[in-house]
Swiss-Prot record:
A motif (Histidine box-3) lies at residues 228-233. It is a multi-pass membrane protein. GO terms for biological process: cholesterol biosynthetic process via lathosterol; fatty acid metabolic process; negative regulation of ferroptosis. Pathway: Steroid biosynthesis; cholesterol biosynthesis. Its cofactor is Fe cation. Its main location: endoplasmic reticulum. The keyword Nuclease does not apply. A motif (Histidine box-1) lies at residues 138-143. It is found in: Endoplasmic reticulum membrane. It comes from the Eukaryota. Belongs to the sterol desaturase family. This is Lathosterol oxidase. The modification Phosphoserine is found at S253.
Length: 299
């Protein structure tokens, strides 16, 4: 995060905000700056990626599903807008520790004999390490003592949209993001890679709420995609993983997505629409409005 803060200091905070007597390495200044940068970045990333996903990826026919809530999209957005600032407070404390040199983040790929190989392996290990921890944290949040108070708000959205991706109780949101911050305190990680992975995990979180269940057949047994996560929202006790199905298989919580078997929400909406159309046809109606008497054939 020091790369982002350095740029923010150079282009904005130092010339326009803080007095010259307040040094850039002052811990209070760093804390305030990180709060601003973290919140601004979170909102931009959320709204930009979720909006693109909602308009260009999300299947809007899912909004016809009976479990899709009234005003759900606006409710998802408002929940997220209220939660992100609270999530940022403990997150900034971890960013501050990284900024002040307590993590194993590094700048120079040449610091390691096999620099590029180490960098590639660190990406792979990051994904598997965080996937493992998120699985157990997520599963723990489903315990009856925690679920009602912390995780239940996220399960309000049985048929989620991309805007539900970050609609968490603040404690829930922070706990599920914690593995990403733990990793660089345990393992060396390049600073640019860390920022890239931070963006990636947020985009992935949006993608598993986008209702697009298309996954190449060869990856279906391994990747925990939107189809898996939608079943988690609807059925509660399955598919806790973030990226992969590995820990769900180990933990006995894996469920083959119902959508891959033609039993998911898309199929439900399709069948519901077909039945509705057939019913209108049987009654000699060309449209729902005509059948409901909202206008006459002469109109």
């Amino acid at each position: 995060m020091d790369l982002v803060l350095s740029a923010a200091d150079y282009y904005f905070f130092t010339p326009y905000v803080y007095p010259a007597t307040w040094p850039e390495d002052n811990i209070i200044r760093q804390t305030v700056s990180l709060l601003v940068v973290t919140n601004l970045g979170a909102y931009i990333l959320y709204f930009f990626c979720a909006t693109l996903s909602y308009y260009f990826v999300y299947d809007h026919s899912l909004m016809k599903h009976p479990q899709f809530l009234k005003n759900q999209v606006s409710r998802e957005i408002m929940f997220t807008v209220k939660s992100l600032p609270w999530i940022s407070i403990p997150t900034v404390s971890l960013f501050l520790l990284e900024l002040r040199g307590y993590s194993k983040l590094y700048d120079d790929i040449g610091d390691f004999p096999n620099g590029w190989i180490h960098l590639i392996m660190s990406v792979i290990s990051f994904l598997f390490f965080t996937d493992m921890l998120i699985y157990w944290i997520h599963r723990g949040l489903h315990h009856r003592l925690l679920y009602k108070h912390i995780h239940k708000p996220h399960h309000i959205w049985k048929i989620p949209t991309p805007f539900a991706s970050h609609a968490f109780h603040p404690v829930d949101g922070f706990l599920q993001s914690l593995p990403y911050h733990i990793y660089p305190f345990v393992f060396p990680l390049h600073k640019v890679v860390y920022l890239g992975l931070y963006v990636l995990v947020n985009v992935w979180t949006i993608s598993i709420h986008d209702g697009d269940f298309r996954v190449p057949q060869i990856f279906r047994p391994f990747i925990n995609g939107s189809a898996h996560h939608t079943d988690h929202h609807m059925l509660f006790d399955y598919n806790y993983g973030q990226y992969f199905t590995l820990w769900d298989r180990i933990g006995g919580s894996f469920k083959h997505p119902s959508s891959f078997e033609g039993k998911g929400p898309h199929s439900y909406v399709k069948n519901m629409t077909e039945k509705e159309s057939n019913s209108l046809a049987e009654n000699g109606c060309k449209s729902k409005k005509l059948c409901n008497g909202e206008f006459t054939k002469n109109e």
